[in-house]
A protein has these predicted regions:
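Outer-membrane beta-barrel channels and translocator barrels
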Residues: 83-86, 121-125, 190-192
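Acidic/polar loop-and-plug regions of large Gram-negative outer-membrane beta-barrel proteins
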Residues: 119, 127-186, 207-251
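Transmembrane beta-strands of outer-membrane beta-barrel proteins
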Residues: 58-62, 88-92, 128-130, 195-199
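Structural signature of outer-membrane beta-barrel domains
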Residues: 4, 67-69, 97-101, 135-140, ...
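Residues on the lipid-exposed face of transmembrane beta-strands in outer-membrane beta-barrel proteins
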Residues: 75-81, 116-120, 181-187, 197
């Protein structure tokens, strides 16, 4: 196998699989530093995902699901030929997840995912395989807010969106796409010896938008200076309230 952990964080980015559950079911999970037949163990555990087309049973599966979470609808289809008489095996899977607005205000979701795998059993000792997958995704984010904001606006409040020309627009939009290609050559030397050679290509693309307000007041509605607690607890804020109250009484 080939290690596809992120080079910066040291972890695997599962969002790159993009909801392709049926395509990545064939896996082995090893906990801790226990010895694994496919890699050295690690403190966080080790997972090996088998993408060879011969690992999938022949058949077709399609499903549609509805949700009220990050996305509203999910459609997926998977087809596998199994190992055919000519020594070839093919598997393909596709998924689409979408939401005009999720359960959190101002969050949309649009994600596609694809998986293609081909394998050729040359003879009893040699086989070659090629697999590719990716999940181009565009989604908007929600923010973590304080209990004070939740008390005023509810648990689904999200300060990252607003109206522009009468339409909802999010200031935090994520675009991600991690296309990956994996090629393998298996050589059975003897009944007890196997040589496995792999080649992998992985390209990571991740971008995130945000409001720019350099040298200007923070425009976020949940900015702490805009909350009642700041006016009540801050010394200058309390002084301002007292002055305002006095002027109001004088009028």
């Amino acid at each position: 196998g080939i290690n596809f952990n992120d080079q910066e964080r040291g972890r695997f980015n599962y969002s790159s699989l993009g909801g392709l559950n049926d395509a990545f079911r064939n896996k082995d999970v090893i906990n801790g530093i226990e010895n694994a037949p496919f890699a050295f163990g690690s403190l966080g555990g080790t997972t090996n995902i088998n993408t060879r087309a011969t690992a999938f049973a022949a058949g077709t599966k399609a499903s549609v699901a509805y949700s009220n979470r990050s996305y509203n609808m999910r459609a997926t289809a998977t087809h596998s030929t199994g190992l055919m008489n000519n020594g070839w095996a093919f598997t393909g899977s596709a998924v689409w997840r979408w939401a005009k607005e999720g359960i959190i205000e101002g969050t949309f979701y649009n994600s596609w995912g694809y998986f293609l795998s081909a394998e050729k059993m040359i003879n009893d000792r040699h086989s070659i395989s090629l697999a590719t997958y990716g999940a181009p995704t565009k989604r908007s984010q929600s923010a973590a807010v304080t209990q004070e904001v939740y008390d005023f606006r509810g648990i689904y409040y999200n300060p990252y969106w607003g109206y522009q020309n009468g339409k909802k627009r999010s200031s935090r939009v994520v675009n991600s796409f991690d296309p990956t290609v994996v090629a393998n050559w298996d050589f059975k030397i003897t009944d007890k010896q196997n040589l496995k050679t792999g080649f992998g290509f992985h390209y990571s693309n991740y971008s995130n938008t945000a409001l720019g307000f350099y040298n200007a007041a923070d425009p976020r509605p949940d900015y702490y200076r805009n909350l009642p607690s700041y006016q009540i607890n801050d010394v200058l804020g309390s002084y301002g309230l007292e002055c305002t109250t006095e002027i109001h009484h004088e009028n």
